C-alpha cells in the first residue's frame, strides 16, 4: 500500500497562503469559517488559526473541516481548546488533511493527536509524515490466509488464540492486570516477531496514561538510555481533551502503525484504550455539528465511523496490524449500540476475571469466558482444538462442582469427580505464567512458551501422567518441564525440613 510522505504538519505554501478565511462563529470546540467564493477547503482539510488573544498570548489552534454549510461557510472541529479565539480572526487552509510523523523516530515517544511530541524530550524527526485519513487497503492487497498470531502467553494461545491481523476485545475492570498484559504483549511481539507496537490512549484518564508510561520505562519496553531501541510509540488524547482530539487520536495511532506495516513490512500491535471513548467523542462531535441523534443518543454515522477505523486494521501481503482494543461496556449493557457495533468487528475476546486475580492467578484471563473465531480444527488443527476443548470441559466441570465442594467437602465427591477437580486445579495454576515485564516486581524471570510446548503441557495434565505432582508445582511456571522440575525441588525441600 502506497504512503505519500508529505512535509511536516501544516506547513503552508505561498500559494495556499492566499486561501485565507475568517472565523464567523464559535460554538465551544466548533468553528464556522467564511472563505472567499471559489476557495472552499475540502472536507477533512486541516485549518490553522494563528494570532494573539486579548492578553497577548500566542494562539495556534488546528481544526478539521467537517461540513460545508453553503454561502462560502465551513464548519470545523478544533483539536485543542478554543480559548482566546474571536470572530474575525484569520484562518489558514493548509490544503491537506492532518499529517503526523511516522517511522522509527516515533518509537519511545508520546504524541498528541497532531503528532506533536508532548514528553519534553525535544523535537521529532518529521521528514516522513503521513495523512491520518486514508482508505483501507484494497482487497487485492489483503493477506487472506488465516494464521494464528503466537503471543507466547499460554492461556491466550491455547484457549482464545489471536488472529494475525485480527481484532481482539480486551474486557476487564480496574486492577485485574490489563496494563501488565498489554506490556507483556508489546514485549513479546518485539522479541518473537521483530515487530513494534503503537498505543493509542483514547479518552482515558491522564493519570493512567502517565502510569503506563512510567511502567513501560521501568520494565524496559521504553528504553530511556537509547530511545531508538524502544518497542512502542504512544499517542494520547485523554479525557480532558476536546472531543475533536479524542475522535481523531485513534486515527493518528493507526496511521503510525500503518507505516510500520506497509513500508517497514513489520508485524504491528495496535492498542486502543478505550474504543468506547472513540464512539463517545464521535457522539459529542455529531451533536455539536447539529446532526439528528440515532439510537440511545449516539451519532447516526456510528457504524460508518467504526467501520472506517476497523477496516484499516488488517493483514496485507507486506505485514500485519493486530489490534487489541479495551472495550468499556456502559452500565454492563452489551446491547448498547457502542459495544454492540464493536463486537461485530472482533475476531477474539480476552476477558480478565477478578476472581482469578484475587486467587493470584496471573494473567487473570478467564478460560471459559474468553472466545476466538480462530479456535476451529481446520485453522488450528485437530490436536490443538481437542486439547483446548478438554481443558475447557475440565474447567467447566470444576466450576459446576464448586458449590458441592463448599457445602459438603471434597470427600463427598465420586472418585472420577475428585480426579477431575485435582486436574482442573493443576490446569488453573498452569494457565498462570511469569511475565518478562513483571520481573522487576516478582523477582521471577519471565517465560515465553511456544504453542507446541503449551499443547504438550496440557495434554500431559489431562492424560493423568502428572497426577502425582503437587498442584503448587504448576503455579507461575513456563513449560511443563519446569513444573516437573519444580515438583522435584519441592519434594527435596520437604524432605530437608523433616
Curated annotation (Swiss-Prot):
ATP binds at residues 172-179. Its main location: plastid. Disulfide bonds: none annotated. One of its GO terms (biological process) is proton motive force-driven mitochondrial ATP synthesis. It is an enzyme of class 7 (translocase). One of its GO terms (cellular component) is proton-transporting ATP synthase complex. Gene3D superfamilies: 2.40.10.170, Bovine Mitochondrial F1-atpase, Atp Synthase Beta Chain, Chain D, domain 3, P-loop containing nucleotide triphosphate hydrolases. It is found in: Plastid, Chloroplast thylakoid membrane. Keywords: ATP synthesis, ATP-binding, CF(1), Chloroplast, Hydrogen ion transport, Ion transport, Membrane, Nucleotide-binding, Plastid, Thylakoid, Translocase, Transport. CDD domains: ATP-synt_F1_beta_C (cd18110), ATP-synt_F1_beta_N (cd18115), F1-ATPase_beta_CD (cd01133). InterPro entries: AAA+_ATPase, ATP-synt_VA_C, ATP_synth_F1_bsu, ATPase_a/bsu_AS, ATPase_alpha/beta_chains, ATPase_F1/V1/A1_a/bsu_N, ATPase_F1/V1/A1_a/bsu_N_sf, ATPase_F1/V1/A1_a/bsu_nucl-bd. Its EC number is 7.1.2.2. Belongs to the ATPase alpha/beta chains family. F-type ATPases have 2 components, CF(1) - the catalytic core - and CF(0) - the membrane proton channel. CF(1) has five subunits: alpha(3), beta(3), gamma(1), delta(1), epsilon(1). CF(0) has four main subunits: a(1), b(1), b'(1) and c(9-12). This is ATP synthase subunit beta, chloroplastic. It comes from Licuala grandis.
